Amino acid sequence: MKKTISIIISIAMCAMLASCGGVKNEVSDTEQPTLIDTMSLEEKVGQILFVRCVDDEQTDDLMSIKPGGILMFGRDFEGLTKDEVKEKIQSYQDKSDIPLIIGADEEGGTVVRVSSNPNLAPEKFKSPQEIYNEGGMDAVVENATEKSELLLSLGVNMNLAPVADVSTNPSDYMYDRSLGQNAEVTADFVSKTVTAMNNAGIMSVLKHFPGYGGVGGDSHQGTVYDDKTAESIRENDLLPFKAGIEAGASCVLVAHNTVNALDSENPASLSPTIHNMLRLSLIHISEPTRP
């Protein structure tokens, strides 16, 4: 290839395309087995990759591996108008034989890849925690719908949200991005947010499995350990993920923290034990690794 392609996330993309209502599926269920049967090994591998296109000159090289989806960061939206974003995303779709998943992180608060651009939104979306504190769960649902509609209007069909971590301690690394409430309230938030996103027609991603509450460090910067007991994880951290899955969440994103009670040898993103907790319920994404 002319340029090095940055592979950001591994994702079970074939399963996602078959199961997620957020993508307009132009290949019928009866045609999919035939399509897969005609794919080369290289093409099948490409379909399980969720990648980032660093610049427009890279698009042809990137599409040659037939990726399942493209993840867009803040710098991919920066300074662009709505029409320019739509044109960029459509150019990706036009070069793909299979409809692409186009993903972005628009949680609200500190993670606003799209609404940070004033050309795309009048102001940055507030965090779910702030919205909840101001107007309760009804306001959170309305906000989730507004975010979904904005992303879909641009051609983004997956929002890497909601944050399902249970955090009530302001010193936790994930506190500001969480709802800041207990497990039961967080589970209700996740369930209603996923339902709102499904109703809008956008894919949701629960994160960061099996929970990032009660952890003080950033696993992007170094090794982070979670010392909670397995019982505490089952009774608290897993509740929002279970609620989100039952509500019809599209995916689960796995964190990089090492959860000692479940697998003390591997970070969650590389843990067969933790992956196997999900495989019978839902496909999952590995937390992005920094290039």
Describe these PLM feature segments.
Residues M1-I9:
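Positively charged n-region of N-terminal signal peptides that target proteins for export
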Residues A18-S19:
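C-terminal motif of bacterial Sec signal peptides marking the signal peptidase cleavage site
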Residues N25-I102, E106-S116, I283:
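N-terminal hydrophobic targeting/anchoring segments and the immediately downstream early-domain regions
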Residues S40, E78-S91, L100, T110-V112, ...:
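Second-shell residues forming the walls of enzyme active-site clefts
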Residues I48, M63-G79, L160, T168-N169, ...:
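Short acidic, glycine-rich surface-loop motifs adjacent to enzyme active sites
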Residues I48-D56, P128-V140, G222-E235:
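Active-site mouth loops of central-metabolism enzymes
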Residues C53-M63, V140-K147, L238-L239:
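Short, acidic/polar
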Residues K126-V194, N198:
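A substrate-binding/cap region within the structured catalytic cores of diverse enzymes
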